[in-house]
Amino acid sequence: MRPMTPRDKIRNFSIIAHIDHGKSTLADRLIQACGGLTDREMSEQVLDSMDIEKERGITIKAQTVRLSYTASDGETYTLNLMDTPGHVDFAYEVSRCLAACEGSLLVVDASQGVEAQTLANVYQAIDQNHEIVPVLNKIDLPAADVDRVKEQIEEIIGLDASDAVQISAKTGLGIPDVLEAIVNRLPPPRGGDHTAPLKAALVDAYYDPYLGVVVIVRVHEGILKKKQTIRMMRTGGVYEIDKVGTFNPKLTEADALGPGEVGYFVASIKEVGDCSIGDTITEDKRPTDKALPGYKDVQPVVFCGLFPMDAGDFDDLRAAMGKLRLNDASFTWEMETSAALGMGFRCGFLGLLHLEIIQERLSREFDLDLIATAPSVVYEMSMTDGTEIELHNPADMPDVVRITEIREPWIAATIYTPDEYLGSILKLCQDRRGIQIELSYVGGRACVKYELPLNEVVFDFYDRLKSISRGYASFDYTLIGHRAENLVKLQILVNEEPVDALAMLVHRDRAESRGRQMCERLKELIPRQMFKIPIQAAIGGRVVARETISAMRKDVTAKCYGGDATRKRKLLDKQAAGKKRMRQFGKVEIPQEAFVAALRMDGD
């Protein structure tokens, strides 16, 4: 068991970068340089533990690793690296990781420059008083333009980039310089008395099938040790610690963790939902008087229904959801039934990427075929009797007569784009009811700030933005609250039956065009039947658009040659009566592709 590290020999730091700028690769190189793993154990992106993280090249869960580094001054330092997610959906995880560190490496791709998500995280780091060391990655690429990117860092972020470390994480070039910069330019942990009552921040937690919940902590004051009884200040849970240790990057047991150290503990906690990220952990018998600042409850922003393709898979889906919830407390769900899709769940997510990842993990790790309904956001409603309600599912909207006001969530979006795509991007934002706040030019690129309704962004805004800008635009957003809007519920009726899975709330000005679009799309996608199928879009009791799928008809008069016309008439009338009866009792099956395609807004 190792002794506790003196505080002045500890460096806690995180790596901030936009998606694909080489953050996880740099982390791999640092682990390799410090001998954290042997070459045989080394795999690409050691810290991205989920397959899906490696495939998409993104970090979803924050990870930590402790490294020992002997610097050029002969001293041995303990480096605690926290690898944070880069995506906007996981902004809260990032903020908690940054709060556990004193410094950051800002990694910027020398061929691409500063992107929107880099900025969001850098500003968070600056708010936490971080010392920031700029690192220019991929300098071996032919397209790398080091001077231009240094200029961008100085102009956009306002950091001095003259002594930025230049590296290529892929080839390992410049990695020793990064390690020296961490030791010499980043500060050791501030304050922290080891005799004071325990005060530690809960940075993250994950579920291990053997150990149960493993909690990642950063100790600020006091000592965290085995057999100690601790209390979570937020949730009030009291636990006895079974194991304490650090990530090297494998779990390595220790006797205790002192001030400034980052490590883990295991304490027979049943599920990750019992641990709130950002909570303060203290001793049960001798608690600290004040919790650490910055905690907030993570609220789901986007909701959608998930239904099994085969109704028999419902129990498997429920079990799979329970397992995912063990590891991801920000994902919420409750059961719901849909007339069109049967039994399923209404799920809440932090954002669209989070939704996609959960869906993909359900189908990949649990081998489930799922139908997902259109993502929707949380609307607030003021009722005539003075009550306030939240609406998660447009199909459950109460009668319009009882509602005095509907408010929808708005976001402040920042978009960075090369100049040539600016026109199309402005048009996209205008089409989505956006309000332009600011347009500025920085380092040869346009920076557009817009306020947009989240409802308009939630389905395919990001895909459209990427396709318009050939992937060059980057996008970041923060929620700015709810605003009252003139919203109506658009219902789609197939064969005069409302399809609850296709119900949505839209702005009154756009309801008609949206309804027409949906009807036209469904007309192409629903297979023809033996009877006529009307497809209608309705607001309240008023139909605003209609398409009709014509019936397939058999030529019943083919066998009549000449002869009496009444014979033909009789056969045609018989066919018409049969079709009428079919239309009365016939159920129209809507194929899954029709659901998905009908929900994609812009036909391209």
Swiss-Prot record:
Positions of GTP binding: D20, H21, G22, K23, S24, T25, N137, K138, I139, D140
Q: Which UniProt keywords apply?
A: Cell inner membrane, Cell membrane, GTP-binding, Hydrolase, Membrane, Nucleotide-binding, Protein biosynthesis
Membrane topology (UniProt): Peripheral membrane protein
Q: Which InterPro entries match?
A: EF-4, EFG_III/V, EFG_V-like, EFTu-like_2, G_TR_CS, LepA_C_sf, LepA_CTD, LepA_IV
List the record's Gene Ontology CC terms alphabetically: plasma membrane
The molecular function terms of the Gene Ontology recorded here are: GTP binding; GTPase activity; guanosine tetraphosphate binding; ribosome binding; translation elongation factor activity
Question: Is Plastid found in the keyword set?
Answer: no
Q: Matching CDD domains, A to Z? A: EF4_II, EF4_III, LepA, lepA_C
- Indicate where this protein resides in the cell: Cell inner membrane
Q: Where is the tr-type G domain?
A: 8-190
Q: Which GO terms describe its biological process?
A: positive regulation of translation
What this protein catalyses is:
GTP + H2O = GDP + phosphate + H(+)
Query: Where does it primarily localize?
Result: membrane
Q: What is its EC number?
A: 3.6.5.n1
Function as written in the Swiss-Prot or TrEMBL entry: Required for accurate and efficient protein synthesis under certain stress conditions. May act as a fidelity factor of the translation reaction, by catalyzing a one-codon backward translocation of tRNAs on improperly translocated ribosomes. Back-translocation proceeds from a post-translocation (POST) complex to a pre-translocation (PRE) complex, thus giving elongation factor G a second chance to translocate the tRNAs correctly. Binds to ribosomes in a GTP-dependent manner.
Q: What family does the Swiss-Prot or TrEMBL record give for this protein?
A: Belongs to the TRAFAC class translation factor GTPase superfamily. Classic translation factor GTPase family. LepA subfamily.
Q: What is this protein called?
A: Elongation factor 4
Gene name of the encoded protein: lepA
